[in-house]
Regions:
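Catalytic-core signature of thiol
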Residues: 21-185
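Bacterial Sec-dependent N-terminal signal peptides
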Residues: 1-22
Length: 185
């Protein structure tokens, strides 16, 4: 019986040694005809700012396509400025205008025309809380609560500083400075 098992094992070993691999069928092979330059890939992470990332990415790609050079604009600069304007509109309409994450292509164009653009190095995402990516969960919770309290509150008159700037605007700007960083001048 031992001889039979040994003979069978040797036979299997020899047969497996003679087996040939099946030729692998190679799939379709792409050939690069023309390679267009591209901008860096961005990650919005945990922020409802796809509107800003996609629009600025489109503008950067268009500048590159037109031969104007490679740019990397700061999404957080546009987000910071447009959120402050949105907060003002939400308070003026007593909350009838939505103050929340999200936006549109036009918000970036509006921000670009009104505030301009700065390079990413001036205002990086996540830098204020030791990250390289955005996380606006806490920012949204805090700023939404402040804007809702002022917009839907029953205050007959809002407090202002000596220059007649409403204090709530300074509070919202400070919140955004803390989470997004101060805006460069």
């Amino acid at each position: 019986m031992k001889k039979l098992l040994t003979l069978a094992a040797m036979g299997m070993f020899c047969i497996s040694g003679m087996a040939q691999e099946q030729p692998k069928e190679e799939g379709f092979v792409f050939t690069t005809v023309k390679e267009n330059p591209i901008t860096s890939i961005k990650n919005q992470n945990r922020a409802g700012t796809c509107w800003c990332y996609s629009t600025l990415s489109f503008l950067e790609a268009e500048l590159l396509r037109m031969g104007k050079g490679e740019y990397d604009f700061s999404e957080m600069f546009i987000v910071h400025n447009t959120y402050l304007d949105r907060a003002d509109k939400a308070v003026r309409t007593h909350g009838d205008i939505s103050f929340s994450q999200g936006g549109s292509f036009y918000d970036v164009i509006y921000g670009m025309e009104k505030f301009g653009l700065v390079p990413e190095e001036e205002m990086r995402p996540g830098v204020m809380y030791g990250d390289t990516l955005s996380n606006h969960n806490e920012l949204t919770a805090v700023s939404d609560a402040v804007v809702a309290a002022i917009a839907k509150g029953r205050l007959s008159k809002l407090q202002a500083d000596a220059n007649n700037v409403p204090l709530w605007k300074k509070a919202i700007a400070s919140i955004h400075d803390i989470y997004l960083g101060e805006r460069p001048e």
